[in-house]
Amino acid sequence: PGTRPLLSGLYRLCGPVRFALRHYLCADGVIYCEEDLLLLSGLQHFAFCRRQWALIHLEQQWEENLRTVEGSLLHSRAHDASLRERRGDLLMLRSLPVVSYGLGLSGQCDVVEFRASPQGVSLRGEEGLWLPYPVEYKRGRPKAHQADELQLCAQAMCLEEMLCCPIPEGALYYGEPRRRTAVSFSQELRQEVRSITEEMHQFYRRGYTPKAKPSKSCNACSLKDLCLPQLVKKRPVSDYLSQAMEDLS
């Protein structure tokens, strides 16, 4: 589906002038067309495993396991309340659609908190200035890799492009510790987001599914039975036949 109807809520909240400026904030002058937009949520899959991303987003393969079900339940709780909630100097928007034509991504933020700040932006129907603070909900504990941080940073970069304001920080909420982990959106993290999204678009244009590279992470992947990484460790039949012919000669 197109992003225009999805983004109408944020358009009404922030006003047409600022919203239209997003086209001029795209990194390196690159602007993707709407039909070229990829799912923002796929960035986390891609950073974790290129093959997992391709199986899901190119080949439309998906299997549930305990981890994916727990993750879906956690996200449903984050999206369960009213889409807009006010708590003093804190305005919370849930399931907020976002887009970046510079990154070529569209998707949803679990929660975006708008905090009263002189560095913020004006919001229609609200007094003062408000600084966005994205919060992404994840199952389990903080991970050794940066896939979650990259997804959150991409959300912030979408919001920056749409609202024309800098967003220095956000947070990941993990289900097991039940607390937030602050994430600083450094230049290094932002550049990694740009590099990965560019690679995603290259894979998508080529329709390319990488070969499996077995690792410890494969055991927890819901797609392991579809991906079959264990086959990579086995010797191809052609190798056996070639060796047998050599032995007979």
Locate each region found by the language model.
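Residues that form generic nucleotide/phosphate-binding pockets
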Residues: F46, H57, R77, E192, ...
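Metal-dependent nuclease catalytic cores that hydrolyze phosphodiester bonds in DNA/RNA
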Residues: L10-P134, K234, E246-S249
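Short, intrinsically disordered, charge-biased short linear motifs at domain edges
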Residues: C33-D36, E199-S215
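Cysteine-cluster motifs in flexible loop/terminal segments that predominantly coordinate metals
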Residues: C49, T209-L248
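Secretory pathway export signals and precursors
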Residues: L7-L10, R22, H45, P214-S217, ...
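Short, mixed-charge aromatic SLiMs
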Residues: A78-A81, G175-S186, A244-S249
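Nucleic-acid nuclease catalytic cores
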Residues: G107, E113-G207, N219-D225
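Extreme N-terminal basic, low-complexity initiation segments
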Residues: P1-L13
